[in-house]
Amino acid sequence: MRVAIVGGGISGLSCAYYLGKEGIDCTVFDPAPGGPMGSVTVEGCILETGPESWLAAKPWAEQLIREIGMGDRLAGSNDASRRTYILRHGRFVAMPEGLQMVVPTRIWPVVETNLFTWGTKIRMGLEIFRSPKTLPDRSVADFVIDHFGAEAVDYLAEPLLAGVYGGSPYDLSAPSVLPRFVEYEQRYGSVVVGTFRDKRKPTGESIFKSLSGGMGTLVEALLERVQLVRARVDSIARYEAGWGVLAEGEWQVFERIVMACGANRSAPLLASIEPQLSDLLAAIPYTGSSIWTFGYRREDVPHALNAFGFLVPKPERRTVMACTWLQTKWLGRVPEGKAVFRCFSTDPDVTRHAMQGDLRRLMDIKAEPIFALNHRWPDSMPQYTVGHSARVAEIEGLAAAVPGLHLVGNAFGGIGIPDCVRSAKTTAAAIVAG
C-alpha cells in the first residue's frame, strides 16, 4: 500500500512516522515541513518560531517523543515561578492562585485580588448554587457571562483564549473549547462544584512540557524517519484504483491519501472531488499570528521577571496580546545576563515598531534590544466557532464515505500538539487496519 500525506506539519509527520513503523510506504509532500514548529538559536538563546510547549496533562506528544528516543530531552516549565500577570488599569495584576482557566477553585485569592470588582467576586461565590442544565451550542462568552459575569470574559476568558486560539470568546464555541466545563454544567449546574468533585491529584510534574533543544528538534527527528518530497501539492485526483497527487509537475498514484495541510488548504484541493466536503472545510474560519521575540541585556530590564509572563485583555490592549518571559518559564534557554520576551499578536502584519514600542511601555524598558526576530503565520489558527462540533461531525461523515480519504490536523479534534499527534496516530491505525 502507498499512502500520500499532503502537509508536513506535526500532524502529517506524526502520521507518516506511525505508518512507517507498520511498514506502510508513505510519502509526505510539503515545501516547508514542520509548519510553524521550529527552533533557532540567537545570541545563545534557544527560540521558537511557533509553538513553544504543550500541556503535560495530554500524554500523546510525550508518548511519541519517548518512542523515538528523545525522552532525555523532555523539559518541564519552571513551575516554581508559575505566575501570570494580567494588565488591569495599566498595571500588572497577578492572576489569582487556584484558577483553572476561568474557574476559581480557591476563595481567598479571589477575595484579595484587584483583578475583579466586588460584583464579580460575589458572582463567583454564588455560582455554586446553580442547578444542572443542558443548553445548545453557545459561545464561550455567553457561557462565562452566564456563570461569572462579563468582567470574567474581559479579564480572563478573552486574554487566555486569544493566545491559544487567536479568536474571540464571542465567536468560539464553549463545547468545543471548554468541553470539561460544559460537562460540569450539565452534571452539576456549577462548574466550580464540578471542578472540585473532579479534582485531579497533583502529579508533581510541570504543567507545560517542551524539548531542551527546542521544538524544532522533534521536527528534525521525525524528518529522519519519513520519506519527504519538498514540494507543494498543486492538485489531487480521484481514480478508480486510488488517488493521484500532482507535485513539481509530476503525477504520482497512491492507494490512500491523508490531508494534513489544514482545512483551508484541503478545501480547494477537494473541491472537484467532493464539493460538499470542500464547502464544509472552507467554512472553518482561520486567523493568523505574529511572534516577535526581543532579546535585551538583563541589566536594561527593571522588572523582576518573576512570572511566566503577562496577558493583555482587550480593554487594555494596544498591540501586544501576550508575552512570555522566556528565561523565567524555561530554565536553560537563555544565558545569564540576558532577558528574552516572546510577544504575540493575531495581526500577522504587526510591525516591529508597534510591537517593540508597546513592550517598552509595558515593561518600562529604555534601551534598544540586542536582537529582534519575527515569525509570521497567516491563516494558521483554525477557529472553533459556535457550531464547530456539528460541522466536524458532518465533515467526518462525508470524508468516511470517500474511499481512501483521511483528514488529520488541528482543525478538527483539538488545536494543541498532543491532539494533533493523537489524531495522526488514530488515522494511521485506521489505515493499517484497512
Label for each model-derived stretch:
Residues E22, D72, R232-R352, R361-L362, ...:
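Mid-domain catalytic core of redox enzymes
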Residues E43-S131:
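Dinucleotide-binding Rossmann-like beta1-alpha1 core, especially the glycine-rich loop
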Residues R83, V103, I107, T120-R238, ...:
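Active-site/ligand-binding neighborhood in enzyme catalytic cores
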Residues R2-V28:
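N-terminal Rossmann-like FAD-binding beta1-loop-alpha1 element of flavoenzymes
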Residues S39, E62-T84, E151-Y155, A283-Y286, ...:
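A short alpha-helix-loop-beta-strand transition element characteristic
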Residues M37-S39, P96-E97, V103-P104, A322-G434:
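Conserved flavin/dinucleotide-binding core of flavoenzymes
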